[in-house]
């Protein structure tokens, strides 16, 4: 197998003996770079006799589309987001994910979203099917964490080990619902008091410094600065779930699949998720979550 990527944390999990990695600026939306990437991809495809090209993101998908057309290779895309569009230009940009020979939808919700919004790009020759996103259940296994690591993590988070923890994982962006989460914590405090538990907002701001400052101001406004922990990242998410007592997915826009809910369930932790999008397929109310 071959991977073309601009880099990232997940590269450390790739078996370098079985997979060859090429690094290109495929994350760029610059039309010139997209074209240059496609030319380089053509060379990679031909030199390595690659028969199937698979894209999971829009910018590299445009490069892959051009490269696969020129080389005559099969093209597969995984449509794993709603890719909001307010203009026809944005919709056209998104449509590359439906221009492949095979379109994989990450959930029934995404399957319906494609049919409803991109029908003009679909035809009888294209196949559209649902393949649910998977998780590594061996990694997200509550029995595999080490107690000493759990204590170390709590110490790093500056949380007392006998206190309950409510965890909201996800990058800091408005649609992930961090503001709603803080508002909800404030309401719980009114009922239970500030000393009852800690709340952890776990995720990088990815450059959204103004949004993070807004969240910090909101927590200060409700006098929760000492109760809420803002953690940029955690290299061992299984451990983060293990030390937490309740997991929350507060997204105010539909999740394509709802990975947080499934990871929490795999770790045998209760999950509260928004009643929209893919979460409706991964959380059965009052049975596998709320």
Positions of PLM-derived features:
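N-terminal strand-loop element at the rim of the active site
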Residues: 1-32, 115, 121-127, 207
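Short His-centered aromatic/hydrophobic patch
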Residues: 55-61, 79
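A conserved mid-protein helix/loop that constitutes part of the nucleotide-sugar donor-binding site
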Residues: 164-190, 213
């Amino acid at each position: 197998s071959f991977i073309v990527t601009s880099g990232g944390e997940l590269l450390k999990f790739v078996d370098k003996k079985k997979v060859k990695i090429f690094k290109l600026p495929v994350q760029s939306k610059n039309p010139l770079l997209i074209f240059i990437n496609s030319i380089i991809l053509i060379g990679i495809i031909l030199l390595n006799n690659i028969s199937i090209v698979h894209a999971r993101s829009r910018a590299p998908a445009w490069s892959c589309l051009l490269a696969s057309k020129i080389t005559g290779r099969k093209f597969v895309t995984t449509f794993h987001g709603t890719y909001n569009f307010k203009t026809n230009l944005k919709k056209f940009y998104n449509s590359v994910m439906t221009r492949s020979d095979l379109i994989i939808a990450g959930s029934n919700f995404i399957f319906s979203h494609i049919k409803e919004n991109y029908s003009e790009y679909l035809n009888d020759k294209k196949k559209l099917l649902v393949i649910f996103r998977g998780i590594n259940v061996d990694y997200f296994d509550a029995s595999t964490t080490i107690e000493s690591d759990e204590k170390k993590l709590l110490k790093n988070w500056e949380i007392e080990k006998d206190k309950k923890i409510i965890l909201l994982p996800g990058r800091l962006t408005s649609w992930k619902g961090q503001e709603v989460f803080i508002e909800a914590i404030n309401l719980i405090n009114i009922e239970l008091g500030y000393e009852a538990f800690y709340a952890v907002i776990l995720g990088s701001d990815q450059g959204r410094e103004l949004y993070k400052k807004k969240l910090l101001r909101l927590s200060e406004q409700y006098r929760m600065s000492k109760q809420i922990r803002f953690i940029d990242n955690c290299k061992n998410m299984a451990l983060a779930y293990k030390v937490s007592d309740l997991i929350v997915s507060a997204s105010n826009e539909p999740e394509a699949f709802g990975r947080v809910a499934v990871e929490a369930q795999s770790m045998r932790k209760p999950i509260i998720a928004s009643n929209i999008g893919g979460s409706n397929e991964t959380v059965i109310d009052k049975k596998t979550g709320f």
